[in-house]
From Swiss-Prot:
Basic and acidic residues composition-biased segments: 8-27
Annotated function: Activates pre-mRNA splicing. May inhibit PP1 phosphatase activity.
GO biological process, alphabetically ordered: RNA processing
Family matches, as InterPro entries: WW_dom-bd_prot_11 (IPR019007)
Bias (Basic residues): 245-256
Region (Disordered): 1-38, 235-264, 317-341
Origin organism lineage: Eukaryota, Metazoa, Ecdysozoa, Nematoda, Chromadorea
Protein name, UniProt field: WW domain-binding protein wbp-11
One Pfam family here: Wbp11
Length: 359
């Protein structure tokens, strides 16, 4: 559009009426320019910052999805932009007017608004993760919750006990009267102390020594079967074995001469009496581990086997008696007494001769 200061529009000249109208409009705009600036400054100066920031926070919640959106998100962002421009104009007005106190309050409110926007962003992120998370994939705590009763909850919620500081001191001594002498040594002879006192003390040990124990006869029990005397060897060796010499004890026991009968044989010399309580032999030493040892031994399996030979081979030459069936000889266990059989060639020749006679 051509300028209003020109008298012609393109190649054609303007009409005188249009030229006059354009000049009047130019003067009016120049006259109202200051009025419009004053109106804008008044609007920016009296802008309520708290109300504007509350509106911006409401729009921020709608844009982030925390609140339902009444309009499209683009419309909400346009409204947010208009309110932000009004805040910027307010800042420019304060800067031009050099009002430092008002500008400081304005900056504090803007910082609080920005921190609230950051909190809303974090809250929106948590809500989005909560919607996308699967509750079945969250691990549950281990243990039975039902076993913990109200007492356990009270213990967890109760405050920690305050420990009092205890000072340990010696008991107070009795007050000594002025002029009273301290007590002297105890009456009587002093005890005789020596360096070898500990060596002469008797050592009390729960371990019982076998030398101090005497043989105790075992009483006869009701045995329905007669005792079996297992004496292996000739009869003359029954009484030929020397008897075991008894141990010489320092303390004489009245039943020390009784015979020890571990197999339950009948004893007709005296009645069976338990003369002392059963004793327990305790050994504090650890038992030695069992060790199995064996020397290598070579066996002659060929000599241990029993050879099966035909009956015809066992017949002597020239013996024409009728063959009498006889029982098989018992298996001989000892290989050194076993009869040496014929070798393989002789047995094979005799077997072939027998077959020729049968054919």
């Amino acid at each position: 559009m051509p300028s209003i200061s020109k008298t012609k529009s393109g190649e054609r000249y303007r009409a005188p009426t249009d030229q006059a109208r354009k000049m009047d409009r130019k003067k009016e705009n120049k006259r109202n320019k200051k009025d419009r600036q004053q109106i804008r400054q008044a609007m920016a100066k009296y802008c309520n910052l708290d109300e504007t920031t509350s509106k911006l926070l409401a729009l921020e919640r709608q844009i982030l999805g925390l609140d339902p959106q009444p309009f499209h998100i683009d419309v909400l962002r346009k409204k947010q932009k208009v309110l932000t421009d009004s805040i910027n104009k307010r800042r420019m007005t304060l800067q031009q007017g050099k009002e430092d106190a008002e500008l400081k309050k304005f900056n504090d409110k803007i910082n609080a608004y920005q921190s609230d926007c950051q909190k809303l962003a974090v809250l929106a992120q948590q809500a989005r993760l909560a919607r996308e998370a699967d509750p079945d994939m969250i691990p549950l705590p281990m243990g039975d919750v039902s076993t913990a009763g109200p007492e356990r909850n009270n213990q967890l919620l109760a405050p920690a006990m305050i420990k009092r500081k205890v000072e340990f001191q010696l008991p107070p001594r009795p007050v000594r009267v002025a002029g009273q002498k301290p007590p002297g040594p105890p009456c009587g002879l002093a005890p005789n102390f020596s360096d070898s006192e500990e060596e002469e003390e008797e050592v009390h040990d729960d371990h019982y020594d076998d030398i101090d124990l005497a043989p105790v006869p075992i009483p006869e029990f009701d045995n329905p079967y007669q005792p079996i005397h297992r004496n292996y060897g000739p009869p003359s060796s029954y009484n030929s074995m020397p008897t075991r010499m008894p141990h010489h004890h320092h303390h004489h026991h009245p039943h020390a001469s009784s015979h020890y009968n571990p197999m339950g044989f009948q004893n007709h010399h005296e009645e069976a009496v338990i003369s002392s309580a059963p004793q327990i032999n305790r050994s504090n030493e650890p038992a030695a581990p069992a060790t199995l040892s064996a020397a290598p031994e070579l066996r002659n399996l060929r000599r241990e086997t029993v050879k099966l030979v035909p009956a015809q081979l066992l017949r002597r030459p020239g013996d024409n008696k009728t063959i009498v069936p006889r029982q098989a000889a018992p298996v001989q266990r000892r290989p050194e007494v076993q009869k040496q059989a014929k070798n393989t060639d002789e047995a094979y020749n005799d077997f072939m001769k027998e077959l020729d006679g049968l054919i």
